[in-house]
Swiss-Prot record:
It comes from Campylobacter jejuni (strain RM1221). This is Ribosomal protein uS12 methylthiotransferase RimO. The gene is rimO. The lineage of its organism: Bacteria, Pseudomonadati, Campylobacterota, Epsilonproteobacteria, Campylobacterales. The keyword GTP-binding does not apply. It is found in: Cytoplasm. NCBIfam families: 30S ribosomal protein S12 methylthiotransferase RimO (TIGR01125), MiaB/RimO family radical SAM methylthiotransferase (TIGR00089).
Amino acid sequence: MSKLYLMSLGCNKNLVDSEIMLGRLSAYELCDEPSKADVIIVNTCGFIDSAKKESINAILDLHEQRKKDSLLVVTGCLMQRYREELMKELPEVDLFTGVGDYERVDEMILKKTNLFSNSTYLQSENSKRIITGSNSHAFIKIAEGCNQKCSFCAIPSFKGKLKSREISSIIAELKDLVARGYKDFSFIAQDTSSYLFDKGEKDGLIRLIDEVEKIKGIRAARILYLYPTSASEALIKRIIASEIFVNYFDMPLQHISDNMLKIMKRGANSTRLKEMLNLMKSAPNSFLRTGFIVGHPGESEADFEELCEFVKDFGFDRVSVFAYSKEEDTAAFDMEQVSFKVINKRLKIIEKIVNEVIEKSFEKEVGQKRLVVCTGESSEGEFFIAAKDLRWDREIDGEILINESECGNLEMGQIYECEILQNLDKKLLAKALRKVDAN
């Protein structure tokens, strides 16, 4: 049996595309060592400069490790964005494809030919997919592309306009995954709250939530990447009212200064953002995640200070911060740039604030009772079982370490009520109290 090595870089949306490719290549034996693989696939990220460099370095590194007569295949956003340049500058690569042909990867390998469709790939209920990284959780991609016009973002230039999957397609995929034992789902897209806008339906997510709740066997779900102008008050209230969708609110804000929100073409002012955030925060057991960019063209010292004060005071649970990356095909590319020195200085300042904010969020968990799902043996050692809070997304929000149990041996993928005993440098030590369900 031929062997396959696949490296998926970038976001969880890329991961879903990689899992689609694995589904098409199920005849191959997956291997952990690229030096033993007959086919090596790199699914690249082309979002910002650091991601582009990571993708190029990965390609060159894998070429160095590959065995003679193996195939090196490069796909994904970086290839779609820089197709002509990379095909000239990467003679190490055997086959190239972009973001439109994930379900034809088996065909291109068989025929040893490049493939570049004009449209972005959108999976259907018939798409074969091999879930990786968990036996109980899966990401569900509900749309591709984006209609927003953020000044800093090039994604619409290579992913295209919003294309939503039909609700029936998503429900069919969910039912199949539930039948295979999956019961925890994260719904993703470039802009999830614009779901079905392209089909003339506002608040399409509400209808999707209604349909998801009818499926027996789903224990928890969450929605990632809400966009401030497309996420309505009705949607937030529907999530809060749901018995399946947890009160996990992931909304990248990018800034809070009205001046910067206008320059960044975010479509909402700080008053609107704070109203939305306060509604989310009012939900029982709410968990708020966001992200900000520092050093975008036009950011004054006053804008930055306003952002820092807001991050310090609001009480987010998780915050990501990024240095502005100058990207071709964006409105910000031709604006007067903030110097690298100033950007790096601001990044260090806000990273310190963010670390303190996240530490407070972990600390307030001590003494709480939380529903958690066991994910396996912890990297901290054989005496700990790793788990995640049922509200959290997979991997990015933290780890719970269980070293005591009042309910016997713990089962992977099973849900338990735990008491949080201690915060150990952003990892929570916990005791399992009881098994919650037997599904």
